[in-house]
């Protein structure tokens, strides 16, 4: 399978790129800085996610696109300074989707977060208070905008909403259509779910919550 990744140098995107390449898929990725590109078996192309010409060039022959973008902060501290444009995720999918449609590429998987959109009230109160009163909220706002854009497309999309992400060396996951409370999942588990779902054809036009 030929896969294009947006967000391949982020922690979740990198896990997916590594797993997909190790599984003998042809993986390409648009990155802002090739200096952050560290996987030998991935075709990194330096450029802007807003560059339609570049997207058109890379989309030829692609079977699926995975979006693992986020609104970045200077650290994991919830109150750390934001260093990404506040609409990076939603603007990127707004540019991406028409290019996919033009090339007849139907399969899209986007990584969002548990608590986004209609799953907000299912989060524990403490988590909601932290998110709403910190800079994490800016990412949640843009993930929500991304989800709305994706849902209104004609693509075969799957929205992935992981619960709290960890760096554990585990690739197990539990996928549900619904909103479980709490829990955690490793980034490797998210990557494994995405690759499994691309191979199975399941969860078309569905929003899936992931936990361990």
Where are these regions (language model features)?
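SDR active-site strand-loop-helix element
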Residues: 6, 30, 68-69, 108-114, ...
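Conserved Rossmann-fold NAD(P)-dependent oxidoreductase catalytic core, especially the SDR/UDP-sugar
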Residues: 34, 80, 91-138, 152
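N-terminal Rossmann NAD(P)H-binding glycine-rich loop of SDR-like oxidoreductase domains
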Residues: 3-23
């Amino acid at each position: 399978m030929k896969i294009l990744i947006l967000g391949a140098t982020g922690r979740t995107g990198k896990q997916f790129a590594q797993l997909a390449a190790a599984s003998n898929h042809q993986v390409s990725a648009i990155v802002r800085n090739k200096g952050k590109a560290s996987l030998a078996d991935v075709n990194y192309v330096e450029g802007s996610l807003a560059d339609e010409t570049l997207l058109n060039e890379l989309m030829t022959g692609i079977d699926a696109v995975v979006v693992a973008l986020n609104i970045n902060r200077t650290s994991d501290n919830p109150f750390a300074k934001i260093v990404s444009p506040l609409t990076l995720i939603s603007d990127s999918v707004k540019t991406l989707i028409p290019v996919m449609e033009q090339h007849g590429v139907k399969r899209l998987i986007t990584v969002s977060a548990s608590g986004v959109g209609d799953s907000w009230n299912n989060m524990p109160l403490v988590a909601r208070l932290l998110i709403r009163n910190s800079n994490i909220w800016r990412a949640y706002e843009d993930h929500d905008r991304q989800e709305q854009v994706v849902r209104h497309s004609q693509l075969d999309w799957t929205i992935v909403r992981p619960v709290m992400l960890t760096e554990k060396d585990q690739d197990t996951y539990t996928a549900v259509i619904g909103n479980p409370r709490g829990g955690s999942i490793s980034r490797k588990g998210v990557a494994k779910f995405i690759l499994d779902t691309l191979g199975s054809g399941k969860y078309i036009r569905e929003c899936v919550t992931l936990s361990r």
